[in-house]
């Protein structure tokens, strides 16, 4: 029978089993190697308020913290949200 992809849509080569993860969007279980991963780095502070906070800060060169978040999507949610 013909196959659609050489890797069968996942990153599992010699492993027999990989643990499932939950989709960030819908909560569906998907294998960890098949899920589409997206690493998001965002500022905690909104861009409009950055200047106000830096002016009000007592420290001169205070770097505002960032928000690091790893998103896992199932295949259908990744296609739907065009990730």
Swiss-Prot record:
Source organism superkingdom: Eukaryota
UniProt keyword Ribosomal protein present: yes
Stored InterPro entries: Ribosomal_eS26, Ribosomal_eS26_CS, Ribosomal_eS26_sf
GO cellular component assignments: cytosolic small ribosomal subunit
BP GO annotations: translation
Keyword field: Ribonucleoprotein, Ribosomal protein
Stated name of the protein: Small ribosomal subunit protein eS26
Native source species: Brugia pahangi
Highest classification ranks of the organism: Eukaryota, Metazoa, Ecdysozoa, Nematoda, Chromadorea
């Amino acid at each position: 029978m013909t196959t659609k992809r050489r890797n069968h849509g996942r990153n599992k080569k010699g492993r027999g089993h990989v643990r499932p993860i939950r989709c960030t969007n819908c909560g569906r279980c998907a294998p960890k190697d098949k899920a589409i991963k997206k690493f998001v780095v965002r500022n905690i502070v909104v861009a409009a308020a950055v200047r106000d906070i830096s002016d009000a800060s007592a420290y001169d060169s205070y770097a505002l913290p960032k928000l690091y978040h790893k998103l896992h999507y199932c295949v259908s949610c990744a296609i739907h949200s065009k990730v």
